[in-house]
Amino acid sequence: FITIHVYKYMMNRLIGYARKLLSVLEEEGIAFEHMPSGIDSISLIIREKHCPPEKLERIVEKYKQLDADSVTVDQDQAIVMLVGRGMTKTVGVAMRATAAFSKAKINIRMINQGSSEVSIMFGVEAKDAKASVIALYNEFFN
C-alpha cells in the first residue's frame, strides 16, 4: 500500500476539503482503501499497484495546489486487520494488540478503528506484515 498524508492546519473547519482530496483520486481513477483523519490531517491509503509513480506524482502535485501545508508519502506499507464482533464489548482489545506489536518490535505507523468497533486497522511497514499477523495470532489465539 501507499499512504498519502495531507496536512492542513485546521482542516476540519474547511468545508469540502476532504471531498476535494477524494476528487483528485477520482480523476486519476484510483479508489482508496482507508481514510484515517484528524483535525489537521487526512491519510489516504491506496493500493500501490493502482498508483504508478507518474500518477502518484500528479496526485501529490494536485494536493499541494489545494494549499496543503504538507504532503508526504509512505510507500511499502501493509494493512493488518483485527476483526471480531465480540470486540465491541471487550475492554482492552486495542491495548493487547499494541502490546503484542511492541513485544515483537513492530512499529505501528497508523491505527484506525471504526465506530462500529468490529475491526481495528493497523498500518505497518510491509516488511513487518507477516510478523504482525503472527504477533496478533499469538496474543489472541494462543
Predicted regions located by residue number:
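A conserved regulatory-domain signal marking ACT and ACT-like small-molecule sensing domains
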Residues: F1-N142
